[in-house]
Curated annotation (Swiss-Prot):
<dbReference type="GO" id="GO:0140078">
    <property type="term" value="F:class I DNA-(apurinic or apyrimidinic site) endonuclease activity"/>
</dbReference>
<protein>
    <recommendedName>
        <fullName>8-oxoguanine DNA glycosylase/AP lyase</fullName>
        <ecNumber>3.2.2.-</ecNumber>
        <ecNumber>4.2.99.18</ecNumber>
    </recommendedName>
</protein>
<keyword id="KW-0378">Hydrolase</keyword>
<feature type="site" description="Important for guanine/8-oxoguanine distinction">
    <location>
        <position position="204"/>
    </location>
</feature>
<dbReference type="InterPro" id="IPR003265">
    <property type="entry name" value="HhH-GPD_domain"/>
</dbReference>
<dbReference type="Pfam" id="PF22175">
    <property type="entry name" value="Ogg-HhH"/>
</dbReference>
<keyword id="KW-0326">Glycosidase</keyword>
<feature type="active site">
    <location>
        <position position="147"/>
    </location>
</feature>
<comment type="similarity">
    <text>Belongs to the type-2 OGG1 family.</text>
</comment>
<keyword id="KW-0456">Lyase</keyword>
<dbReference type="InterPro" id="IPR023170">
    <property type="entry name" value="HhH_base_excis_C"/>
</dbReference>
<keyword id="KW-0234">DNA repair</keyword>
<dbReference type="GO" id="GO:0016799">
    <property type="term" value="F:hydrolase activity, hydrolyzing N-glycosyl compounds"/>
</dbReference>
<comment type="function">
    <text>Catalyzes the excision of an oxidatively damaged form of guanine (7,8-dihydro-8-oxoguanine = 8-oxoG) from DNA. Also cleaves the DNA backbone at apurinic/apyrimidinic sites (AP sites).</text>
</comment>
<dbReference type="GO" id="GO:0006284">
    <property type="term" value="P:base-excision repair"/>
</dbReference>
<dbReference type="InterPro" id="IPR011257">
    <property type="entry name" value="DNA_glycosylase"/>
</dbReference>
<keyword id="KW-0511">Multifunctional enzyme</keyword>
Amino acid sequence: MDSLISIPFLNDESVRSTIYRKVEEFRSIGKSSKEVLFKELVFCILAANTSASMSLRMQESIGDGFLYLSRDDLRKALKENKYRFYNVRSDFIVKSRNIIDDLPALVASPDHEGSRDYLVENVYGIGYKEASHFLRNVGIFDFAILDKHIMKWMAQYYPVKKNTSRKNYLYNEEIFRNISAGFGIEPGILDLFIWYEETGTVIK
């Protein structure tokens, strides 16, 4: 690990307590029903290119509707709640319902890389960032969620590549994994500390 890298909040007991409570919350979600897991997947679909706070607001408003609303009704609900990508994301969510029954096995599988690849290949609107986000939110902390906040932070210390391909994402992720190994923290947990440093909050 580069000795110049500093994450002050790693030693802040209040922040550590907040983050590790969130970690336990994620682990609990991972043991939930397939319906709860799907709604968590929807959260990650909706957060892409918007924000976690916007996606959380959609979850609170629409709730179980993500499981059963028709495409048109879901589109209307997203639009009424001022979600920007209501057309394409409603389509993604409805088309992705066929994976609901697979989610418990994917989350329980010891092959985390395989689970992530399966999500990327089989869920509409899910790339490596979103799949990593989902797996982190259900208690799998192996992966880096390389959003704009994390990429900005990494770019202070290392030359990073744009996440425009699988190859580039995995290249950047390997850098992040090496950093996390240096701190002795799993990538998906270190991500929370950096996100807190960059934004002053932890949502999910």
